[in-house]
């Protein structure tokens, strides 16, 4: 039986989603252990979006196979019971066809990056936003972001450790929303390169901070090298919002 779960987590104190050889602090391993504790079965979780250390999720999706059958609410409640001291929560569980794969069946992924743009420290949101002290010109950021829409070679916006064979990606939408000193950057696409969202955000922040001509984004794209783009935004402002199937 194949089960699909939707998961919310605070990624602050984890090594990321993926289980690692020299660390027992991955989100994947915590959930796999919780499933074993209530079912007695060792399972392998496959996720829709592998988040890095410090990145949060509002709607991560994962699947796993079990021989035993359980009522869906019991799966959700049992996993949550064994995770009760950990900031990981299963929001929903459902049965899916054996052809379903959390990663390869995904149609679109949605990320959101949260910024607080003010000089006074963000006392209540530390660890959940990137605080940028210099004033940002959001209109310039929006104009620069338009050049990233569509299909491009995004070599300038991937980490040096990115293992993707093909740097071509299609960005469906970038929406920059300002509410007072809070700025949320929403990005959606079917797939992303490693650190792509964080590098895009870091680059847009530099545009907004330095009042750079938005047309300069085309030059960054065309150089196809990591050094052309801006800094990598810190992980703690990034949220995996949801995944469409």
Curated annotation (Swiss-Prot):
InterPro entries hit by this protein: PsdUridine_synth_cat_dom_sf, PsdUridine_synth_TruA, PsdUridine_synth_TruA_a/b_dom, PsdUridine_synth_TruA_C, TruA/RsuA/RluB/E/F_N
Residues binding substrate, per UniProt: 111
Catalytic activity, reaction form: uridine(38/39/40) in tRNA = pseudouridine(38/39/40) in tRNA
Segment forming the signal sequence: none
Catalytic residues of the enzyme: 52 (nucleophile)
Keywords: Isomerase, tRNA processing
Cross-referenced Pfam families: PseudoU_synth_1
E.C. designation(s): 5.4.99.12
Catalytic EC class: isomerase
Subunit-structure text: Homodimer.
UniProt-listed PANTHER family: PSEUDOURIDYLATE SYNTHASE, TRNA PSEUDOURIDINE SYNTHASE-LIKE 1
Family of the protein in this entry: Belongs to the tRNA pseudouridine synthase TruA family.
Function: Formation of pseudouridine at positions 38, 39 and 40 in the anticodon stem and loop of transfer RNAs.
Full protein name: tRNA pseudouridine synthase A
Originating species: Wolbachia pipientis wMel
């Amino acid at each position: 039986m194949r089960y699909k779960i939707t998961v919310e987590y605070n990624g602050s104190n984890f090594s990321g989603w993926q289980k690692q050889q020299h660390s027992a602090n991955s989100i994947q391993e915590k959930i796999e252990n919780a499933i074993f504790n209530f079912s007695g079965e060792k399972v392998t979780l496959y996720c829709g979006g592998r988040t890095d250390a410090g990145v949060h999720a509002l709607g991560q999706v994962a699947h796993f196979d079990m021989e035993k059958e359980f009522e869906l609410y019991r799966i959700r409640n049992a996993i949550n019971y064994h995770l009760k001291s950990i900031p990981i929560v299963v929001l929903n569980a459902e049965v899916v066809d054996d052809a379903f794969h959390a990663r390869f069946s995904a149609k679109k992924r949605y990320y959101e990056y949260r910024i607080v743009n003010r000089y006074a420290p963000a006392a209540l949101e530390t660890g959940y936003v990137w605080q940028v002290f210099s004033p940002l010109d959001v209109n310039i950021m929006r104009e620069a972001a338009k050049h990233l829409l569509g299909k491009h070679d995004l070599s300038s916006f991937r980490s040096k450790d990115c293992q993707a064979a093909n740097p071509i990606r299609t960005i469906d939408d970038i929406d920059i929303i300002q509410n007072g000193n809070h700025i949320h950057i929403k990005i959606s696409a079917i797939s992303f390169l490693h650190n792509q969202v964080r590098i895009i955000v870091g680059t847009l922040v530099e545009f907004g901070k330095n009042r750079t001509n938005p047309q300069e984004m085309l030059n960054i794209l065309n150089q196809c090298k990591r050094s052309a783009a801006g800094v990598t935004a810190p992980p703690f402002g990034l949220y995996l919002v949801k995944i469409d199937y």
